[in-house]
Structures are given as C-alpha cells and as structure tokens.
Amino acid sequence: MTASYLAELVETWREWDWRAREAWLNRHPQFLADIGDATVHFVHLRSERADAPALLVMHGWPHTFALQLDFADLLPDFHVVVPSFPGFAFSPTYADGPMTEVRLAATMHGLMTDVLGYDSYFTYGEDVSANVNDLIAGSYPDSVRGIVATHSHFPSRAERADLTAPDEVAFFARLDEWGGANGAYGHVQATRPDTLATSLNDSPAGLLAWLVEKLVEWSDTPAGDPRVVESRISRDRLLTEAMIYWTTQSIGTSFRPYYEGADRPDVMSPVQVPASVHIQRHEGDYPESLARRFYQDLRIFERLSEGGHFTVAEVPAVMAERLRAFAREVGAL
C-alpha cells in the first residue's frame, strides 16, 4: 500500500456509485437464520437442477462473503451457500463465549443440514475458515461429500516440532521468517483487537488502508505498484469489501478469530472424506507429504500456476472448473 494509491482509492470511494453495487449484491438471494446461539447471514444460490450437489463456500479475513460471489456465480450446477461468519458483515457475533473453530464448524454444518436441509454437501474454506473447513470434513464425514482446499492443512506448532523431512522443515521455517517480517497485523489483532477496531471504525480511510494492504500483499500479483491488485480483484470489489465493513462496523468482531484462537488451533484428526487440494501461489512450496498424511482420501493434488491467498476470488473460473472436476471424480456430477 502506498499513500498515493490510498488517496486514489479514497477519491474513487467519494464518487463511487454504491447503489449500483448494492443492486448487484441484492441480486443474490440473502437470508438470516438462527442456528443455536448464532444468527447467520448467508447467500443461497439454488441450481435449476433439484438434484444438484450442495456446496458451502466460506470466506476468510480480511474479506467478506461478497468477495466469494464471483466464484459462486459460475456454479449454476451446484446449490451454493455463501455465509458470513458470526461477527463478519451482516452476521452478528456470538452472544457469548469464544469463537472457536469447533464452534464455527458446528454452526456452518447446522446451516447446511438443519436449516437448509441438505443431506450432504461439499465444503470450501480459506484463511481463517481453512481450519473450519478441515473440522467440518473431519467432524461430519457422513454429511460431507468432499472437501476442497486452497489453504491445505497446517500441523499445529507442537506437531511441527516433530517434523524431520527436509522439505517440511524448510516450509515452516520460511513461513516463520515471513511472519517475523510481515505478521505484525496478526499480532495486534490477536492482542489489542478493540484498540485497533476503535481507530478503524472511526476512519473510513484507515479502514480502507488496513483491508486493501492485505488484499494487495497476499494476491498473486508482482510486488511494486499496488494498483496491480486490480488485475485480480477489481476496484469495485475492493471498495465493496470496505463498504460492507464500514456500514456494519464489523472490523472489530472480525478480529475475534485472531484474539480467541488463531494461535491455539483446535486438535484435528486426519480427514477421511474425499479431498481436492490446490496449492495457491503464496504457499507454492507446501509439501505434498503433509497433505497426504492429513487428507487420507486425497483424490487431487496440484500446484496452481496462478491465484494467491484469495484463490477463488482471484481466479474464479479456474477454481470453478477444478471444483467440477472433483465433483465428477466422486460421482456428484
């Protein structure tokens, strides 16, 4: 992020036709559902095929459900559900208690089965929903037809201490080095979330800078000019994310996964359901051996030639075709 690019975005935001973007969002049927102690906002795009497979598409941070909709729109052969996690966008946070990954997995599973009535579904998650994705597949194998991952499973820090394979050790050493230089955002969100949120909820420009900086740095674009992010994520989409966070004042509650559990991941058993793993470019050296140990019915493993941290948002057509290929592999299409 640079001051000149931020000024350019702010100026665009001042003149931007939000009503046109709002109309685009509203073309996607949206609902609220009470699931246990949570109220969850979600988009539900039903296929014209009554017997189409169902798909849960979760978002991460710093984005919202809206960034996943270009991907969802390319999947008319699925019933697609795109929820907002509790505390993000139009989903209020849990009334009490921590936002653990196990709790999020139970809420998302309840949405798909108890609320929407799907007997089975595919699941996709990324970033803060990556572990939730794994937990859904591991905890509810009778309901999950398959799991799609672009952020493949990471063993816990305790488990990493026992790794001996050179490529596995080197991968996490590189991540630790990256975190030391680039992970300050996560540390402050995990330790001083309310202080930071007070500032960001008071300044649209500050909020925009905090969000877009991550979208710039984590997308599959060359370093240098931050404007290049718009080749992957258009300016309309960048401003939509900022506008949703601003109007809902949800940046503070979006930090809860960091504050309440990002450094204390829930223990996970290996996943037994069919899995399709697509390694995004920022984790291009992720060892295949890690995926094969955790996803014990790994049908597809590939290293993507394009697409960064926000994979389904950056290369939606690529990932839509990958999903269809996986669904055909397991007999769902």
Predicted regions, residues:
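Conserved HGGG/HGGXW glycine-rich cap/lid loop of the alpha/beta-hydrolase fold
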Residues: 48-90, 327, 331
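Non-catalytic accessory segments flanking enzyme active sites
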Residues: 1-46, 246-249, 253-264
